[in-house]
Amino acid sequence: MAKISKKLSAAYEGIDKQKAYPLFDAIKLAQEKSITKFDGSINIAVKLNLDTTKVEQQLRGSISLPNGNGKNVRVLVLSEDITKEQAAAVGADYFGGADYIQNIEKMLNQIDVIITNQKMMPLLAKLGKVLGPRGLMPNPKIGTVTNDVLKAVEEFKKGRIEYRTDTYGNIHMSIGRVSFETAKIEENANALLSLIRSKKPATVKGQYIQNIAISPTMGPGIKVIINNN
């Protein structure tokens, strides 16, 4: 633990904690200051001026990052309208129909996304208390309840990911890997920020985006200059 703290302290050297950096520079610094031995994530945290007790100020959806985020998303497809072979052909990791739902609780640590259609949702409702807190409950807002299951699988395997505000109005997301080209991570970040700006609720007053920070899986957080509020 002491060794990690020492590495983290060293990683902060050369970074002005009071300064906000241009987005490209912040990403580059986060890549350079990562202290993991593996190819860690580059993450973005966006603080928004939202009152999340109001439903209209709770943001949730999904986005296809231009360059993906480097994560292998494990997809479970629940459908009786397509075959296992069709699902596998577009990259699904697991597949089943109504009788497969009983297996889900045993494999929560093996799946990242469940994609299904509206017909299956009543059967999944009984697992709401299990799937909801883990962010696994399919939802049409994020494209995981759809009539075109095969297309949705392709999109999520290519890098479509969910975004949502937490209780405090923050959005946290992985936007790439340390090994990515900096420009590609910047492109991902700009795509997300553009989407967030487009989703600004009409009832929000004052500065909408209050803070942006970039950080590696392990390493310092770096403030970003906020533009176009």
UniProtKB/Swiss-Prot annotation:
Entry-linked Pfam families: Ribosomal_L1
PROSITE patterns named in the record: RIBOSOMAL_L1 (PS01199)
Name of the featured protein: Large ribosomal subunit protein uL1
Protein source organism: Ureaplasma urealyticum serovar 10 (strain ATCC 33699 / Western)
Superkingdom, taxonomy of origin: Bacteria
Regions crossing the membrane: none
GO cellular component, as recorded: large ribosomal subunit
Gene Ontology annotations of biological process type: regulation of translation; translation
Gene encoding the protein: rplA
Keywords per UniProt: Repressor, Ribonucleoprotein, Ribosomal protein, RNA-binding, rRNA-binding, Translation regulation, tRNA-binding
Molecular function GO labels: rRNA binding; structural constituent of ribosome; tRNA binding
Quaternary context: Part of the 50S ribosomal subunit.
SUPFAM superfamilies assigned: Ribosomal protein L1 (SSF56808)
Function: Binds directly to 23S rRNA. The L1 stalk is quite mobile in the ribosome, and is involved in E site tRNA release. Protein L1 is also a translational repressor protein, it controls the translation of the L11 operon by binding to its mRNA.
Family statement: Belongs to the universal ribosomal protein uL1 family.
